[in-house]
Amino acid sequence: MDQHLEEMLKMDEESRIAYLKAFTRLACADGSFDENEKRFIKNLAKTYHVSEDGTAEIFSCAEDDAIIEDLKKIKSRRVALELIKELCILAHADDVLTDEETLFIGRVGQAMGVELDKIEQISNWVIDKIILAEEAKIIFEE
């Protein structure tokens, strides 16, 4: 079992739900919550052993402030950094990073004690990773 999954499973279900609600909120930020995004979040809910009721709660569109308050309860820095990374990946998935997505990721990070320069560092790492993946497709003629 990887370190992140281990950390997630140590948290109570309420905290795991809060973590996943952040994904739902970010996925809705561009006005479109498609089936691929829903499937991705459902699979994460299964991986993190969230109950069916908890999974339904994840898909209820909570207000930003409520999500932020719930995320403040998560004290693991490792989980916070992982959440920022995953939110950055999700935000870049459609090749359009909106101001609303950027603001939400910043608010999440700050609520969880992640410094703005660390959030920027993670975001830049995600962008570099995406660029390398695209370059690999060209190099290996995929």
Predicted segments with their positions:
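Small-residue-enriched hydrophobic alpha-helices in membranes
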Residues: M1-A27, D34-E142
